[in-house]
Amino acid sequence: MDMAGVSRVALPYLRFVVTACACGVGLVELGPTSKASEHFWVDLRGEARLAISDNSLLTIKDRTPDVVLNMSPGINVRWESKRVRGGIDYALDYLYFISDKSADYRHSGFATIDAEVIKDHLSLNGRASLRQQFLDQRGSITNSFANKTDNRRLIQNYTGSAILKGGLRDIADYRLTYRYGLARTPADNLDDLTLPVNFSDTNSSEFVASIGSGNRFNNFSWRISADSSRVMRSLNVNDFKNEHIAGELTYKFNRFIQIFGSTGYSRNNFQADVLSEDGRTWNAGFRWTPGRKLDLTVSTGKEGQREVWYAALQYFFSARLDFNGTYQDTLSSNTIVTNDSLQGFTFDAEQGISNQSGLPIDETDPIFTYSDVDFRRRNGRGTFTLRKKRTTFYATGNIEWRTFDDSTGTAVSWGISSGFDRNVTENTSIKGSVGYRQSRFEGQFRIDNYIEANLDWTTELSRYFRAAIGLSHSERQSNEAGADLEENAVTFYLRGTF
Protein backbone atom coordinates (compact mmCIF):
# COMPACT_ATOMS: atom_id res chain seq x y z
CA MET A 1 0.00 0.00 0.00
CA ASP A 2 1.36 3.49 -0.89
CA MET A 3 1.64 6.34 1.60
CA ALA A 4 -1.63 7.90 0.42
CA GLY A 5 -3.39 4.63 1.13
CA VAL A 6 -1.79 4.38 4.56
CA SER A 7 -2.93 7.90 5.39
CA ARG A 8 -6.46 7.19 4.20
CA VAL A 9 -6.69 4.18 6.50
CA ALA A 10 -4.82 5.59 9.49
CA LEU A 11 -5.96 9.20 9.82
CA PRO A 12 -9.56 8.55 10.96
CA TYR A 13 -8.25 6.05 13.51
CA LEU A 14 -5.66 8.50 14.81
CA ARG A 15 -8.20 11.31 15.11
CA PHE A 16 -10.61 8.98 16.92
CA VAL A 17 -7.97 7.71 19.37
CA VAL A 18 -6.44 11.14 20.01
CA THR A 19 -9.85 12.71 20.66
CA ALA A 20 -10.98 9.90 22.96
CA CYS A 21 -7.67 9.73 24.82
CA ALA A 22 -7.47 13.51 25.20
CA CYS A 23 -10.84 13.51 26.91
CA GLY A 24 -9.87 10.48 28.95
CA VAL A 25 -6.50 11.80 30.10
CA GLY A 26 -7.98 15.15 31.06
CA LEU A 27 -10.67 13.46 33.10
CA VAL A 28 -8.35 10.90 34.70
CA GLU A 29 -6.55 13.72 36.46
CA LEU A 30 -9.87 14.97 37.78
CA GLY A 31 -10.99 11.60 39.08
CA PRO A 32 -10.71 10.18 42.60
CA THR A 33 -7.30 9.53 44.08
CA SER A 34 -8.26 6.23 45.66
CA LYS A 35 -6.87 3.49 43.39
CA ALA A 36 -9.06 0.88 45.09
CA SER A 37 -12.14 2.55 43.64
CA GLU A 38 -10.84 2.46 40.06
CA HIS A 39 -11.39 -0.40 37.61
CA PHE A 40 -9.75 -0.67 34.20
CA TRP A 41 -10.36 -3.31 31.51
CA VAL A 42 -8.65 -3.81 28.13
CA ASP A 43 -9.95 -6.49 25.76
CA LEU A 44 -8.18 -7.22 22.48
CA ARG A 45 -10.09 -9.16 19.87
CA GLY A 46 -9.80 -10.60 16.41
CA GLU A 47 -12.77 -11.32 14.18
CA ALA A 48 -13.08 -13.31 10.97
CA ARG A 49 -16.20 -13.30 8.80
CA LEU A 50 -17.17 -15.13 5.64
CA ALA A 51 -20.18 -13.57 3.95
CA ILE A 52 -22.11 -14.72 0.89
CA SER A 53 -24.15 -12.01 -0.88
CA ASP A 54 -26.39 -12.31 -3.94
CA ASN A 55 -25.92 -8.63 -4.88
CA SER A 56 -22.50 -7.41 -3.77
CA LEU A 57 -22.55 -4.36 -6.08
CA LEU A 58 -26.09 -3.35 -5.03
CA THR A 59 -27.28 -3.05 -8.62
CA ILE A 60 -30.82 -3.11 -9.98
CA LYS A 61 -30.05 -5.53 -12.82
CA ASP A 62 -27.27 -8.03 -13.51
CA ARG A 63 -26.84 -8.74 -9.80
CA THR A 64 -23.35 -9.97 -8.90
CA PRO A 65 -23.10 -12.75 -6.28
CA ASP A 66 -19.92 -12.70 -4.27
CA VAL A 67 -18.05 -14.22 -1.36
CA VAL A 68 -16.51 -11.63 0.96
CA LEU A 69 -13.74 -12.32 3.47
CA ASN A 70 -13.52 -9.93 6.42
CA MET A 71 -10.67 -9.75 8.95
CA SER A 72 -11.13 -7.29 11.80
CA PRO A 73 -8.74 -6.59 14.70
CA GLY A 74 -10.32 -4.55 17.48
CA ILE A 75 -9.90 -3.23 20.99
CA ASN A 76 -12.33 -2.47 23.80
CA VAL A 77 -11.29 -0.35 26.77
CA ARG A 78 -13.46 0.45 29.81
CA TRP A 79 -12.68 2.47 32.88
CA GLU A 80 -14.80 3.10 35.97
CA SER A 81 -14.19 5.05 39.15
CA LYS A 82 -16.28 7.01 41.62
CA ARG A 83 -16.46 10.04 39.37
CA VAL A 84 -15.50 8.82 35.91
CA ARG A 85 -16.99 6.23 33.59
CA GLY A 86 -15.68 5.69 30.08
CA GLY A 87 -15.43 3.24 27.23
CA ILE A 88 -13.70 3.00 23.86
CA ASP A 89 -14.41 0.42 21.18
CA TYR A 90 -12.58 0.46 17.85
CA ALA A 91 -12.23 -1.97 14.94
CA LEU A 92 -10.55 -1.85 11.54
CA ASP A 93 -12.23 -4.04 8.93
CA TYR A 94 -10.32 -5.45 5.98
CA LEU A 95 -12.65 -6.81 3.30
CA TYR A 96 -11.61 -8.93 0.32
CA PHE A 97 -14.09 -9.46 -2.53
CA ILE A 98 -13.36 -12.74 -4.28
CA SER A 99 -15.30 -11.98 -7.50
CA ASP A 100 -12.93 -9.22 -8.66
CA LYS A 101 -10.11 -9.66 -6.09
CA SER A 102 -10.56 -6.11 -4.77
CA ALA A 103 -10.06 -4.97 -1.17
CA ASP A 104 -11.50 -2.30 1.10
CA TYR A 105 -10.81 -0.88 4.58
CA ARG A 106 -13.55 0.34 6.90
CA HIS A 107 -13.37 1.96 10.34
CA SER A 108 -15.89 1.62 13.15
CA GLY A 109 -15.59 3.00 16.63
CA PHE A 110 -17.35 4.59 19.55
CA ALA A 111 -16.13 6.30 22.70
CA THR A 112 -17.95 7.63 25.75
CA ILE A 113 -16.62 9.52 28.75
CA ASP A 114 -18.65 10.91 31.67
CA ALA A 115 -17.05 12.62 34.66
CA GLU A 116 -18.25 14.46 37.74
CA VAL A 117 -15.45 16.99 38.26
CA ILE A 118 -17.02 18.84 41.19
CA LYS A 119 -19.67 16.83 42.99
CA ASP A 120 -23.19 18.15 42.36
CA HIS A 121 -21.80 21.16 40.46
CA LEU A 122 -19.61 20.46 37.42
CA SER A 123 -19.75 17.50 35.04
CA LEU A 124 -18.07 16.82 31.70
CA ASN A 125 -18.86 14.28 29.03
CA GLY A 126 -17.74 13.41 25.54
CA ARG A 127 -18.78 11.17 22.68
CA ALA A 128 -16.94 10.07 19.54
CA SER A 129 -18.23 7.97 16.68
CA LEU A 130 -16.79 6.44 13.50
CA ARG A 131 -19.43 4.80 11.33
CA GLN A 132 -19.80 3.68 7.74
CA GLN A 133 -23.06 5.20 6.51
CA PHE A 134 -25.03 5.62 3.31
CA LEU A 135 -25.13 9.28 2.27
CA ASP A 136 -28.07 9.35 -0.16
CA GLN A 137 -31.31 7.53 0.62
CA ARG A 138 -32.10 7.53 -3.11
CA GLY A 139 -28.93 5.56 -3.82
CA SER A 140 -27.81 2.01 -3.05
CA ILE A 141 -28.64 1.06 0.56
CA THR A 142 -28.74 -2.22 2.48
CA ASN A 143 -28.33 -3.61 6.00
CA SER A 144 -25.45 -5.95 5.09
CA PHE A 145 -21.72 -5.16 5.07
CA ALA A 146 -20.86 -7.66 2.31
CA ASN A 147 -21.09 -5.22 -0.58
CA LYS A 148 -19.46 -2.12 -2.00
CA THR A 149 -20.89 1.13 -3.26
CA ASP A 150 -19.80 4.75 -3.61
CA ASN A 151 -22.83 5.68 -1.51
CA ARG A 152 -21.19 4.27 1.66
CA ARG A 153 -18.63 6.56 3.31
CA LEU A 154 -16.99 7.09 6.69
CA ILE A 155 -18.79 9.62 8.93
CA GLN A 156 -16.88 10.97 11.95
CA ASN A 157 -18.70 12.75 14.77
CA TYR A 158 -17.25 14.14 18.00
CA THR A 159 -19.06 16.00 20.79
CA GLY A 160 -18.05 17.30 24.19
CA SER A 161 -20.12 19.13 26.76
CA ALA A 162 -19.80 20.77 30.16
CA ILE A 163 -22.60 21.33 32.68
CA LEU A 164 -22.22 23.77 35.57
CA LYS A 165 -25.04 24.00 38.09
CA GLY A 166 -25.55 25.35 41.57
CA GLY A 167 -27.79 27.37 43.84
CA LEU A 168 -28.05 30.70 45.61
CA ARG A 169 -29.05 29.34 49.00
CA ASP A 170 -32.69 28.25 48.69
CA ILE A 171 -33.78 31.28 46.65
CA ALA A 172 -32.59 30.34 43.17
CA ASP A 173 -30.64 27.76 41.19
CA TYR A 174 -28.70 28.12 37.97
CA ARG A 175 -27.53 25.82 35.17
CA LEU A 176 -25.06 26.49 32.33
CA THR A 177 -24.57 23.97 29.52
CA TYR A 178 -22.14 24.18 26.61
CA ARG A 179 -21.75 21.57 23.87
CA TYR A 180 -19.21 21.59 21.04
CA GLY A 181 -19.37 19.27 18.06
CA LEU A 182 -17.25 18.28 15.07
CA ALA A 183 -18.40 16.37 11.98
CA ARG A 184 -15.90 15.18 9.39
CA THR A 185 -16.67 13.39 6.10
CA PRO A 186 -15.19 13.16 2.59
CA ALA A 187 -18.43 14.63 1.19
CA ASP A 188 -17.14 18.23 1.19
CA ASN A 189 -14.71 17.38 -1.63
CA LEU A 190 -16.41 18.94 -4.65
CA ASP A 191 -13.78 17.45 -6.98
CA ASP A 192 -14.69 13.86 -6.07
CA LEU A 193 -17.12 12.86 -8.81
CA THR A 194 -17.82 9.49 -7.18
CA LEU A 195 -19.73 11.12 -4.32
CA PRO A 196 -23.53 10.80 -4.68
CA VAL A 197 -24.11 14.03 -2.69
CA ASN A 198 -21.98 16.83 -1.25
CA PHE A 199 -22.23 18.44 2.17
CA SER A 200 -19.93 20.27 4.57
CA ASP A 201 -17.66 19.42 7.43
CA THR A 202 -19.11 21.27 10.41
CA ASN A 203 -18.22 22.84 13.75
CA SER A 204 -21.15 23.37 16.10
CA SER A 205 -21.59 25.35 19.32
CA GLU A 206 -24.65 25.08 21.56
CA PHE A 207 -25.10 27.09 24.75
CA VAL A 208 -27.99 27.06 27.24
CA ALA A 209 -28.20 29.17 30.41
CA SER A 210 -31.03 29.28 32.93
CA ILE A 211 -31.78 30.61 36.38
CA GLY A 212 -34.87 29.67 38.33
CA SER A 213 -36.57 29.54 41.70
CA GLY A 214 -35.00 27.49 44.47
CA ASN A 215 -36.36 25.12 47.10
CA ARG A 216 -38.07 27.96 48.96
CA PHE A 217 -40.71 28.04 46.22
CA ASN A 218 -42.99 25.01 46.51
CA ASN A 219 -46.15 25.30 44.43
CA PHE A 220 -45.18 28.38 42.43
CA SER A 221 -41.88 28.58 40.55
CA TRP A 222 -40.22 30.64 37.83
CA ARG A 223 -37.35 30.28 35.36
CA ILE A 224 -35.52 32.53 32.88
CA SER A 225 -33.52 30.86 30.12
CA ALA A 226 -31.52 31.69 27.00
CA ASP A 227 -30.03 29.42 24.35
CA SER A 228 -27.99 29.77 21.20
CA SER A 229 -27.15 27.13 18.56
CA ARG A 230 -24.75 27.68 15.68
CA VAL A 231 -23.34 25.38 12.99
CA MET A 232 -20.43 26.60 10.86
CA ARG A 233 -20.01 24.81 7.52
CA SER A 234 -16.91 24.33 5.38
CA LEU A 235 -18.63 24.88 2.02
CA ASN A 236 -20.01 28.17 0.73
CA VAL A 237 -23.54 27.63 2.04
CA ASN A 238 -25.78 29.17 4.68
CA ASP A 239 -24.71 28.51 8.29
CA PHE A 240 -27.21 27.49 10.97
CA LYS A 241 -28.18 29.94 13.72
CA ASN A 242 -31.07 29.72 16.18
CA GLU A 243 -31.46 31.78 19.38
CA HIS A 244 -34.11 32.08 22.11
CA ILE A 245 -34.71 33.89 25.38
CA ALA A 246 -37.77 33.16 27.52
CA GLY A 247 -39.34 33.40 30.95
CA GLU A 248 -41.46 30.56 32.36
CA LEU A 249 -43.93 30.28 35.25
CA THR A 250 -45.09 26.98 36.76
CA TYR A 251 -47.90 26.37 39.22
CA LYS A 252 -48.23 23.01 40.99
CA PHE A 253 -51.79 22.33 42.17
CA ASN A 254 -50.78 19.14 43.97
CA ARG A 255 -48.34 16.27 43.55
CA PHE A 256 -50.32 14.99 40.55
CA ILE A 257 -50.71 17.94 38.19
CA GLN A 258 -48.96 21.18 37.33
CA ILE A 259 -49.37 23.79 34.62
CA PHE A 260 -46.75 26.00 33.01
CA GLY A 261 -46.45 28.80 30.49
CA SER A 262 -43.70 30.87 28.94
CA THR A 263 -43.16 33.84 26.68
CA GLY A 264 -40.02 35.11 25.02
CA TYR A 265 -38.20 36.15 21.89
CA SER A 266 -36.56 34.08 19.13
CA ARG A 267 -34.58 34.71 15.96
CA ASN A 268 -32.74 32.66 13.35
CA ASN A 269 -31.17 33.00 9.91
CA PHE A 270 -33.53 30.69 7.99
CA GLN A 271 -34.43 31.82 4.47
CA ALA A 272 -38.00 30.54 4.05
CA ASP A 273 -40.73 32.83 5.41
CA VAL A 274 -42.55 29.98 7.13
CA LEU A 275 -39.37 29.00 9.04
CA SER A 276 -37.80 32.40 9.66
CA GLU A 277 -38.22 33.83 13.18
CA ASP A 278 -37.60 37.29 14.58
CA GLY A 279 -40.17 38.08 17.24
CA ARG A 280 -42.21 36.95 20.24
CA THR A 281 -42.88 33.33 21.16
CA TRP A 282 -45.20 31.70 23.69
CA ASN A 283 -45.83 28.23 25.09
CA ALA A 284 -48.29 26.67 27.57
CA GLY A 285 -48.90 23.16 28.85
CA PHE A 286 -49.28 20.75 31.74
CA ARG A 287 -47.61 17.77 33.40
CA TRP A 288 -49.69 14.96 34.89
CA THR A 289 -48.21 12.31 37.21
CA PRO A 290 -51.16 10.50 38.85
CA GLY A 291 -48.93 7.74 40.21
CA ARG A 292 -45.65 5.92 39.78
CA LYS A 293 -46.73 4.32 36.50
CA LEU A 294 -47.63 7.37 34.40
CA ASP A 295 -45.79 10.57 33.51
CA LEU A 296 -47.42 12.75 30.81
CA THR A 297 -46.36 16.21 29.59
CA VAL A 298 -48.14 18.14 26.82
CA SER A 299 -47.57 21.70 25.61
CA THR A 300 -48.41 23.91 22.65
CA GLY A 301 -47.32 27.33 21.50
CA LYS A 302 -46.17 29.50 18.63
CA GLU A 303 -42.71 30.36 17.30
CA GLY A 304 -42.63 32.74 14.36
CA GLN A 305 -45.34 31.53 12.00
CA ARG A 306 -45.18 27.98 13.31
CA GLU A 307 -47.68 26.44 15.69
CA VAL A 308 -45.66 23.97 17.76
CA TRP A 309 -46.55 21.00 19.96
CA TYR A 310 -44.57 18.91 22.41
CA ALA A 311 -45.58 15.69 24.17
CA ALA A 312 -43.79 13.09 26.30
CA LEU A 313 -45.35 9.94 27.76
CA GLN A 314 -43.84 7.27 29.97
CA TYR A 315 -45.97 4.43 31.26
CA PHE A 316 -44.92 1.37 33.25
CA PHE A 317 -47.39 -1.45 32.70
CA SER A 318 -45.32 -3.60 35.04
CA ALA A 319 -41.74 -3.96 36.22
CA ARG A 320 -40.95 -5.74 32.94
CA LEU A 321 -43.10 -3.89 30.39
CA ASP A 322 -42.94 -0.16 29.71
CA PHE A 323 -43.69 2.40 27.00
CA ASN A 324 -41.84 5.59 26.10
CA GLY A 325 -43.16 8.07 23.57
CA THR A 326 -42.26 11.61 22.47
CA TYR A 327 -43.28 14.20 19.91
CA GLN A 328 -41.43 17.45 19.27
CA ASP A 329 -41.32 20.28 16.74
CA THR A 330 -37.96 22.03 16.36
CA LEU A 331 -35.73 23.83 13.88
CA SER A 332 -32.58 21.82 13.34
CA SER A 333 -29.77 20.61 11.09
CA ASN A 334 -28.10 17.27 10.43
CA THR A 335 -25.29 18.20 12.82
CA ILE A 336 -27.61 19.11 15.71
CA VAL A 337 -29.64 15.91 15.22
CA THR A 338 -26.45 13.83 15.30
CA ASN A 339 -25.19 15.61 18.44
CA ASP A 340 -28.47 14.89 20.21
CA SER A 341 -28.33 11.24 19.18
CA LEU A 342 -24.72 10.81 20.33
CA GLN A 343 -25.42 12.52 23.64
CA GLY A 344 -28.09 9.94 24.47
CA PHE A 345 -25.78 6.95 24.01
CA THR A 346 -24.18 5.29 27.04
CA PHE A 347 -21.81 2.37 27.57
CA ASP A 348 -23.30 -0.82 29.00
CA ALA A 349 -20.95 -3.63 30.06
CA GLU A 350 -23.32 -6.32 28.79
CA GLN A 351 -24.91 -4.72 25.71
CA GLY A 352 -22.14 -2.39 24.62
CA ILE A 353 -23.22 1.06 23.44
CA SER A 354 -26.91 1.54 24.25
CA ASN A 355 -29.45 4.19 23.26
CA GLN A 356 -31.79 6.29 25.40
CA SER A 357 -34.16 3.34 25.91
CA GLY A 358 -31.38 1.07 27.17
CA LEU A 359 -31.40 -0.96 23.95
CA PRO A 360 -28.33 -1.69 21.78
CA ILE A 361 -27.88 1.12 19.26
CA ASP A 362 -29.50 0.68 15.87
CA GLU A 363 -26.69 0.50 13.34
CA THR A 364 -29.00 1.26 10.41
CA ASP A 365 -28.38 4.48 8.56
CA PRO A 366 -30.18 7.81 8.84
CA ILE A 367 -33.64 7.87 7.29
CA PHE A 368 -32.95 11.13 5.42
CA THR A 369 -30.26 12.08 2.92
CA TYR A 370 -27.34 14.10 4.32
CA SER A 371 -27.31 17.74 3.21
CA ASP A 372 -26.37 21.29 4.23
CA VAL A 373 -30.00 22.46 4.10
CA ASP A 374 -31.53 23.23 7.50
CA PHE A 375 -35.07 22.14 8.26
CA ARG A 376 -38.10 22.13 10.51
CA ARG A 377 -38.21 18.75 12.24
CA ARG A 378 -41.50 17.28 13.50
CA ASN A 379 -40.64 13.95 15.02
CA GLY A 380 -42.71 11.38 16.91
CA ARG A 381 -41.63 8.00 18.24
CA GLY A 382 -42.83 5.34 20.63
CA THR A 383 -41.20 2.17 22.00
CA PHE A 384 -42.60 -0.79 23.91
CA THR A 385 -39.95 -2.75 25.82
CA LEU A 386 -40.55 -6.12 27.48
CA ARG A 387 -37.84 -7.65 29.66
CA LYS A 388 -37.90 -11.18 31.00
CA LYS A 389 -35.22 -13.34 32.56
CA ARG A 390 -33.78 -14.54 29.27
CA THR A 391 -35.52 -12.39 26.67
CA THR A 392 -35.75 -8.73 25.75
CA PHE A 393 -38.41 -7.78 23.22
CA TYR A 394 -39.09 -4.37 21.73
CA ALA A 395 -41.53 -2.84 19.26
CA THR A 396 -41.05 0.69 18.03
CA GLY A 397 -42.65 3.11 15.61
CA ASN A 398 -41.64 6.56 14.44
CA ILE A 399 -42.62 9.24 11.98
CA GLU A 400 -40.81 12.40 10.94
CA TRP A 401 -41.62 15.36 8.72
CA ARG A 402 -38.78 17.58 7.50
CA THR A 403 -39.64 20.90 5.86
CA PHE A 404 -36.47 22.16 4.21
CA ASP A 405 -35.26 25.76 4.10
CA ASP A 406 -34.59 25.72 0.33
CA SER A 407 -38.30 25.63 -0.61
CA THR A 408 -38.08 22.08 -2.00
CA GLY A 409 -40.97 21.03 0.24
CA THR A 410 -41.48 18.50 3.01
CA ALA A 411 -40.08 14.98 3.18
CA VAL A 412 -41.89 12.34 5.25
CA SER A 413 -40.53 9.08 6.61
CA TRP A 414 -42.33 6.65 8.91
CA GLY A 415 -41.52 3.14 10.02
CA ILE A 416 -42.23 0.31 12.40
CA SER A 417 -39.88 -2.39 13.65
CA SER A 418 -39.66 -5.09 16.28
CA GLY A 419 -36.94 -7.33 17.60
CA PHE A 420 -35.90 -9.73 20.30
CA ASP A 421 -32.77 -10.97 22.05
CA ARG A 422 -33.00 -14.31 23.86
CA ASN A 423 -30.42 -16.24 25.85
CA VAL A 424 -31.27 -19.82 24.86
CA THR A 425 -28.68 -21.27 27.22
CA GLU A 426 -25.86 -19.86 29.29
CA ASN A 427 -23.59 -19.92 26.23
CA THR A 428 -26.03 -19.55 23.32
CA SER A 429 -28.24 -16.66 22.24
CA ILE A 430 -30.45 -15.76 19.31
CA LYS A 431 -31.68 -12.37 18.22
CA GLY A 432 -33.71 -11.08 15.34
CA SER A 433 -35.43 -8.00 13.99
CA VAL A 434 -37.80 -7.02 11.20
CA GLY A 435 -38.67 -3.53 10.03
CA TYR A 436 -40.64 -1.59 7.44
CA ARG A 437 -40.16 2.05 6.41
CA GLN A 438 -41.81 4.32 3.86
CA SER A 439 -40.07 7.46 2.61
CA ARG A 440 -41.66 10.27 0.59
CA PHE A 441 -38.96 12.55 -0.81
CA GLU A 442 -39.17 16.33 -0.88
CA GLY A 443 -39.82 18.01 -4.21
CA GLN A 444 -40.57 14.68 -5.90
CA PHE A 445 -43.34 12.15 -6.36
CA ARG A 446 -40.96 9.35 -5.42
CA ILE A 447 -42.07 6.97 -2.66
CA ASP A 448 -39.79 4.18 -1.39
CA ASN A 449 -40.87 1.21 0.71
CA TYR A 450 -37.96 -0.40 2.53
CA ILE A 451 -38.08 -3.81 4.22
CA GLU A 452 -35.30 -5.41 6.22
CA ALA A 453 -34.96 -8.50 8.39
CA ASN A 454 -32.10 -10.02 10.40
CA LEU A 455 -31.60 -13.23 12.36
CA ASP A 456 -28.41 -14.05 14.28
CA TRP A 457 -27.44 -17.15 16.27
CA THR A 458 -24.40 -16.92 18.57
CA THR A 459 -22.64 -19.47 20.77
CA GLU A 460 -19.59 -19.32 23.01
CA LEU A 461 -17.15 -22.07 22.06
CA SER A 462 -14.90 -21.35 25.01
CA ARG A 463 -13.95 -18.55 27.34
CA TYR A 464 -12.14 -16.76 24.53
CA PHE A 465 -13.92 -17.78 21.32
CA ARG A 466 -17.41 -17.15 19.97
CA ALA A 467 -19.06 -18.27 16.73
CA ALA A 468 -22.16 -16.95 14.98
CA ILE A 469 -24.32 -17.33 11.87
CA GLY A 470 -26.35 -14.41 10.53
CA LEU A 471 -29.05 -14.07 7.88
CA SER A 472 -30.10 -10.72 6.44
CA HIS A 473 -32.59 -9.48 3.86
CA SER A 474 -32.89 -5.95 2.45
CA GLU A 475 -35.43 -4.84 -0.12
CA ARG A 476 -36.50 -1.48 -1.55
CA GLN A 477 -39.65 -1.12 -3.63
CA SER A 478 -40.02 2.27 -5.32
CA ASN A 479 -42.53 3.93 -7.63
CA GLU A 480 -39.58 5.37 -9.57
CA ALA A 481 -38.45 3.25 -12.49
CA GLY A 482 -35.13 1.52 -11.92
CA ALA A 483 -34.97 2.24 -8.18
CA ASP A 484 -35.96 -1.19 -6.82
CA LEU A 485 -33.20 -2.99 -4.95
CA GLU A 486 -32.75 -6.30 -3.11
CA GLU A 487 -29.94 -8.15 -1.34
CA ASN A 488 -29.77 -11.37 0.69
CA ALA A 489 -26.70 -12.36 2.67
CA VAL A 490 -25.44 -15.16 4.92
CA THR A 491 -22.55 -14.47 7.29
CA PHE A 492 -20.37 -16.93 9.22
CA TYR A 493 -18.50 -15.35 12.08
CA LEU A 494 -15.69 -16.31 14.49
CA ARG A 495 -14.45 -14.01 17.25
CA GLY A 496 -11.53 -14.41 19.60
CA THR A 497 -10.96 -12.24 22.69
CA PHE A 498 -7.52 -12.03 24.25
What do these predicted ranges mean?
Residues 1-39:
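Cleavable N-terminal export/targeting peptides
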Residues 31-498:
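Gram-negative and organellar
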